[in-house]
């Protein structure tokens, strides 16, 4: 463990009062301890750790949100991941399945599989994110066409934000990848970025100075949804449960915008017990689906089971897929806005 990491452990250990509030929403703590105070004390005394420990954390930030004294295990475990990368000289243990992330990221920044900013006739671009592009290219195209109507001249940038690399602890490689984005933003004179992904919203917002980063949901809420979709959900005779993605748990404008969109659609929906700033991860956070698949699978099942309605509606592609793996019928809000999935749902419920 690096000296810096040890100092972080000491800070968190001193702050922790052992109330276990964080354990209500964290599966990895249940695997490694009965009380986070004990775990932090052990790390402090040993000055070392099992490399799987930090890669079992979903890095969702729930702990810091609910902790009465401000303990932030996400920041600590991300730093410990960086220690593992440094100590292994970038060659992470095979059990972490990091090669899958490396391949994904190399393709996501390859000129063969991605493009530079296209169709830019203003200072605004749409940054849909790699998950949405890979899973729903039709929806990305339709969403972009909508944006071109309400914000003429909007360009589009088909790249990844690099967060998978950052969350694996490879900060140097992340800076290299993110530098590609910054160079393109600078050369094309981009000033405003509309993101379709919660991870992209946070990553670009936290790492780009002087750029305005806006969520697609805020744009949709203020500009209005496509006219032909207004009130269309009123014809459905079943309900939805809304799942808030964890990356933007602290961004209230996104929470409000999404709920405004659902109301414009005319959808009947309910809230999960853990919602908004206290939402739970879907199980895909922190690349744990690769590094500790059992923890991810168990937590996904738990989160999906917390929805009482026929369908789960969310606004993150990874969350959508996770809820389906958890055994629920799940839709991305863009499925309803820019693809005719209302008809599919009606057929399913006949």
Question: What positions do the PLM features span?
Answer:
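Iron-sulfur-cluster electron-transfer modules
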Residues: 10-13, 30-196, 201-211
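Cysteine-cluster motifs in flexible loop/terminal segments that predominantly coordinate metals
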Residues: 16-22, 60-63, 283-288
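Cofactor-cradling patches in redox/metallo enzymes
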Residues: 131-218, 249-266, 270-350
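C-terminal amphipathic alpha-helical segment
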Residues: 223-264
């Amino acid at each position: 463990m690096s000296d810096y990491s040890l100092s972080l452990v000491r800070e968190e250990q001193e702050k922790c009062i052992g109330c276990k509030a964080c354990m209500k929403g964290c599966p990895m703590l249940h695997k490694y301890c009965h009380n986070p105070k004990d775990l932090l004390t052990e790390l402090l005394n040993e000055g070392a750790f099992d490399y799987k420990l930090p890669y079992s954390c979903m890095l969702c930030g729930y702990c810091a949100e609910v902790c009465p004294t401000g303990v932030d295990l996400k920041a600590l475990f991300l730093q410990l991941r960086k220690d593992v990368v440094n100590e292994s000289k970038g060659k992470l243990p095979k059990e972490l399945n990091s090669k899958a992330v490396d391949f994904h990221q190399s393709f996501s920044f390859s000129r063969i599989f991605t493009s530079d900013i296209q169709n830019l006739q203003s200072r605004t671009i749409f940054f849909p994110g790699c998950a949405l592009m890979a899973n729903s290219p039709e929806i990305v195209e339709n969403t972009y066409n909508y944006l071109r109507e309400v914000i003429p001249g909007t360009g589009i940038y088909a790249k990844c934000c690099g967060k998978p690399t950052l969350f694996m602890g490879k900060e140097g490689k992340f800076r290299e990848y993110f530098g590609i984005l910054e160079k393109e933003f600078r050369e094309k004179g981009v000033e405003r970025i509309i993101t379709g992904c919660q991870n992209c919203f946070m990553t670009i917002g936290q790492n780009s100075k002087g750029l305005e980063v806006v969520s697609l949901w805020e744009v949709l809420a203020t500009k209005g949804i496509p006219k032909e979709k207004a009130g269309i959900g009123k014809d459905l005779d079943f309900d939805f449960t809304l799942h808030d993605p964890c990356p933007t748990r602290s961004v209230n404008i996104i929470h409000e915008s999404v709920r405004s969109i659902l109301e414009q659609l005319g959808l009947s929906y309910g809230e999960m017990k853990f919602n908004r700033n206290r939402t739970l991860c879907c199980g895909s956070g922190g690349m744990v689906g690769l590094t500790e698949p059992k923890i991810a699978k168990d937590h996904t099942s738990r989160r999906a089971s917390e929805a009482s309605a026929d369908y789960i509606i969310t606004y993150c592609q990874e969350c959508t897929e996770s809820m389906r793996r958890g055994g629920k019928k799940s839709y991305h809000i863009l499925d309803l806005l820019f693809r005719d999935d209302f008809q599919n749902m009606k057929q399913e419920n006949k």
